Amino acid sequence: MQNINIRENGLTVEFGIREDGIVELLDFTAEDVANAKTTPTDPEAIFPVVEVQVTGKTTRHMHAYKHNAGSASLDFRYDTHSLKETANGKELVLQMKTGYGLEAAYHMQFFNGIPVVRTWTVLTNAGTGNIGLEYVSSFIYQGVSGNGGQSYYKKTEIYVPNNSWSDEAQWNKHAASDLNLTGMETDGFNCPGFGMNRFWYGSNSSWSTCEYLPMGYAQDTETGEM
């Protein structure tokens, strides 16, 4: 496996390029904490850096309402990458291609002086036929609360910023298990070791912050990471 390692503004970021060309985000942690690389127990488990659902394509496994199992995600293979300086800080761009004309550019923008990134994905149809898209991820990482010895659903707290008119930024703390983010005790034997459920919040229409602010964070109560 080829690796892309970046240490920038207090962040440790590592991408892995598998022998088949699929790119995975292996590590995304603060420099001062132990390494929390994604280490799936199933050797056939693949965590692509971009999740895409193409109309007519199937899914890789059970996923319920989560958008992390589109079979088209495994069609994207590494092409090139660049790390360039911008006015705000360094920007990584990973270029990936499929065999049917759909191409992806995964961007990770670092910011000078703070351990924060902004990520987004640009898809381009370089082929001759129409391609239907149902969703594309902007950021996906399998290693949240990956340090320590406890399972994520037993130690993760999720902070949600409720919002309203003249009642802004009302942060609320929830245990992962209280949000139905539980795990499976069995990992293997056709069981993935993690639950099928998602936790979602957001807004629509012209008032983007009507009920929630577009932010949030998770804390690992075992290690103190946020």
Regions flagged by a language model, labelled:
Residues 4-226:
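Polysaccharide-binding surfaces and accessory modules of carbohydrate-active proteins
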